[in-house]
Curated annotation (Swiss-Prot):
It comes from Salmonella newport (strain SL254). InterPro entries: HAD-like_hydrolase_sf, HAD-like_sf, HAD-SF_hydro_IA, HAD_sf, PGP-like_dom2, Phosphonoacetald_hydro. It catalyses: phosphonoacetaldehyde + H2O = acetaldehyde + phosphate + H(+). The keyword Magnesium applies. Belongs to the HAD-like hydrolase superfamily. PhnX family. The active site is at D10, K52. One of its GO terms (cellular component) is cytosol. This is Phosphonoacetaldehyde hydrolase.
Length: 269
């Protein structure tokens, strides 16, 4: 049948961890712990969505971070430096990720509604398997259990922005066509992943990395501040090629209804 059969969901900032704070805070701490180099939360957010080793590599290439590194060490960051920061990052992230495993508001009800429509729930993450093996059961205790998940280091081909994790979900879930899948993510590399996999893509402008606020801060934010942050996030997600941008996963059923109508007219992603 010519309709959406599966959604492939990101984790932090999409289904759990409103604002995607678990990884950002740990990047700051890992740089500090490994080399006594300071980076800001805003800098830590810039490459979000990549695998974590690649994320650290991208952070080292940010002009401001590279300038600090050069001032301290007289050279740019090396692969060995990235390895050292990653080695500091991993135990910190494994220890902390369960503290950020609660589903974002609306996720549980949305998943139930999608399943009632016969839609399968795939997922993938920029987290490596060692982190996911802690996060997945912790999220399950809170009621979020996707049908499948893939970690960024699971596949020999690699992770985002390549299509491989999304396509592995297609295989595992037995979906007949990538055009019948929606990739949902709060960061640009995840949107690119979906596009590279030939899927419809939906960006989340409020719940995730680009908006970058805690749930409590969001609840007390003025309408003006919300609008400014939403526009900033949405512009980045649309620039990455997202077919749709909405606030959070709770808005997804309406988007899928719209996509189903387009599929019925013969449209493709």
């Amino acid at each position: 049948m010519n309709r959406i059969h599966a959604v492939i969901l990101d984790w932090a900032g999409t289904t759990v961890d409103f604002g995607s704070f678990a990884p950002t805070q740990i990047f700051v701490e890992a740089f500090r712990q490994a080399f006594d180099v300071e980076i800001t939360l805003a800098e830590a957010r810039v490459p979000m969505g990549l695998g974590k080793w690649q994320h650290i590599e991208a952070l080292g290439k940010l002009p401001a971070v590279d300038a600090r590194w050069q001032a301290k060490f007289g050279r740019s960051m090396s692969a060995a430096d990235i390895d050292a920061i990653y080695a500091a990052f991993m135990p910190l992230q494994i220890a902390k990720v369960v503290d950020f495993s609660s589903p974002i508001a609306g996720v549980i009800d949305t998943i139930a509604a999608l399943r009632a429509e016969g839609i399968k729930i795939g997922s993938c993450s920029g987290y490596p398997r060692a982190v996911m093996e802690r996060l997945v059961p912790a999220a399950a205790e809170h009621g979020y259990r996707p049908d499948h998940w893939v970690a960024t280091d699971d596949l020999a081909a690699g992770g985002r922005p390549g299509p491989w994790m999304a396509l592995q979900n297609v295989i595992a879930l037995g979906i007949d066509a990538v055009a019948h899948c929606v990739k949902v993510d709060d960061a640009a590399p995840g949107i690119s992943e979906g596009l590279n996999a030939g899927m419809w893509t939906v960006g989340l402008a409020v719940s995730g990395n680009e908006f970058g606020a805690t749930w409590d801060a969001y609840q007390t934010m003025s309408k003006e501040d919300v609008a400014v942050r939403r526009e900033h996030a949405a512009s980045k997600l649309y620039a990455a090629g997202a077919h749709y941008v909405v606030d959070s996963l709770a808005d997804l059923p309406g988007v899928i209804a719209h996509i189903n109508a387009r599929l019925a007219q013969g449209e493709r992603p």
